[in-house]
């Protein structure tokens, strides 16, 4: 997706330790035109599948998931990083955040993730695949079916794709970062 790649090279910031900051257009301040283009691309990539629900984890995955759900005319559900007292029939799992270097217990109500669901998971980043593995666990607990996972940005050098594909998961990434060494952003063509 050329528009996204151009924006990453133009406005993305690299930090030591393999961190790519895209908060000026994806996960703090958002560019709605870019987000619509991201949604359109996920719709194209997963056209012809039997997806009937979009899923993500709060917070940075919500915008692309909403846009994708809107364009596909499908409901969107997100796993919460804190369990509210009002949640019933909660499914939960532990997820490690690479960026924040901490564990979260993520929860979702089984009222909104059921055996009837064919799920497309959408998120901002694929690094080591920790969040995605947590989602796979929640989907298994619910009895739903995972159709595939779509990521705005994949950091290929952190091997999350390999982890997921070894489990039979279809992975689609819109921009694949090959390297961030010396804080230079290298994107796969």
From Swiss-Prot:
SUPFAM superfamilies: PRTase-like. Pathway: Purine metabolism; XMP biosynthesis via salvage pathway; XMP from xanthine: step 1/1. It is an enzyme of class 2 (transferase). Keywords: Cytoplasm, Glycosyltransferase, Purine salvage, Transferase. Signal peptide: none annotated. GO terms for molecular function: xanthine phosphoribosyltransferase activity. It catalyses: XMP + diphosphate = xanthine + 5-phospho-alpha-D-ribose 1-diphosphate. HAMAP family: XPRTase (MF_01184). PANTHER family: HYPOXANTHINE/GUANINE PHOSPHORIBOSYLTRANSFERASE, XANTHINE PHOSPHORIBOSYLTRANSFERASE. Belongs to the purine/pyrimidine phosphoribosyltransferase family. Xpt subfamily. Homodimer. This is Xanthine phosphoribosyltransferase. It comes from Bacteroides fragilis (strain ATCC 25285 / DSM 2151 / CCUG 4856 / JCM 11019 / LMG 10263 / NCTC 9343 / Onslow / VPI 2553 / EN-2).
């Amino acid at each position: 997706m050329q528009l996204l790649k151009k924006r990453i090279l133009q406005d993305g910031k690299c930090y030591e330790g393999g961190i790519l900051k895209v908060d000026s257009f994806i996960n703090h301040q958002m560019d709605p035109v870019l987000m619509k283009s991201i949604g359109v691309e996920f719709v194209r990539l997963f056209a012809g599948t039997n997806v009937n629900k979009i899923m993500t984890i709060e917070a940075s995955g919500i915008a692309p998931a909403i846009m994708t759900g809107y364009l596909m005319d499908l409901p969107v559900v997100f796993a919460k990083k804190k369990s509210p007292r009002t949640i019933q029939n909660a499914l939960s799992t532990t997820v490690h955040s690479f960026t924040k270097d901490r564990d979260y217990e993520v929860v979702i109500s089984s009222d909104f993730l059921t055996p009837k669901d064919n799920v497309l998971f959408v998120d901002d980043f694929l690094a080591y695949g920790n969040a995605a593995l947590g989602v796979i666990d929640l989907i298994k607990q619910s009895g739903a079916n995972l159709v595939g996972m779509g990521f705005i940005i994949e950091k290929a050098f952190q091997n999350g794709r390999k982890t997921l594909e070894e489990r039979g998961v279809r992975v689609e990434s819109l921009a694949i970062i090959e390297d961030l060494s010396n804080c230079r952003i290298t994107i796969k063509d």
